Amino acid sequence: LTPTEEELEAMKKEPAYGQKVLYYMADGCTAGPTVAAHLGYYEEAGLEAEGVKGNSYTEALGSGQATVAVGHIATMLVPITNNVDITFVGGAHIGCKSLYVLADSEYNTTEDLKGTNISAPNGIGKSDYNITCLLLDADGIDPQEDVNITAVSADACLTAMTNGEISAALLSDTFAYGLVKDGTLKCVRSLLDEDFADENCCMIAMNRTFVKENPVISKKITQAVQKAHSYMRDNPEEATQMLLDQGWNGGSYEMNVMLNNSLQFGLDQDFTEVSLRDVVEKYVRLGLIQNMDNTDEIMSIAWTPVLD
């Protein structure tokens, strides 16, 4: 991680040299950039860093208010094709959302959900909608024709299920954990299922113009975040306790260790590129990306492998 003499000389010639890396402060499974700062990895990479907060990492990255963040492909991919100034630079983890139904309901598979209302809590056209479409499509269910995807906020989904307004909802595994454990909900399809376990859910993303103008600094930033992800993967108990102590994870220690172990933090570049391309192809086919239809062209802006 420490820059070589050659890297340091190259960094000094880049416009962002001497400026603080603005990492987007997030918690839970997207805390990699924050953990990198806490463990001193940016300094080790020859960089100064400062955390920034906001309502949307997509807006923060696209406007240059943040340099780096970890977040859902499903949140950022469509904006990237709509000229938002973001590119993916590395993989983060698999997981971390699933389709849930009432445990005592008649629904046991996605096939059973045909003709019903399913909630994508953060809204139509947003990340939950996109993920729901992918999960249904994988089982041969047309998300536009075979079901009705609607928006019911996560905290209202249980009531809506009980009242029969919706059959299922896409929820974060963290949110649903206690409800599954107490027998209220069951999972019928997940991004952790075997056929999705070879796809990134979340990725390291950066401001695209910054990456273009500062390739070596961008490489060192990405390496710092990847080192944090490796730490989280290799030391799940210690990392979980640290995240809880810092207030970056909610819920129980037991739940967080289990979920952190399932996410496979720190995915390599080849895996990430192949899985991103696969997701792009699905988004184009399902009409989730509407203003571009060439996978290579989309990949040319969405994927910048700074570690190569």
Can you describe what each PLM-predicted range is?
Residues K212-Q290:
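Secondary-structure end/capping motifs
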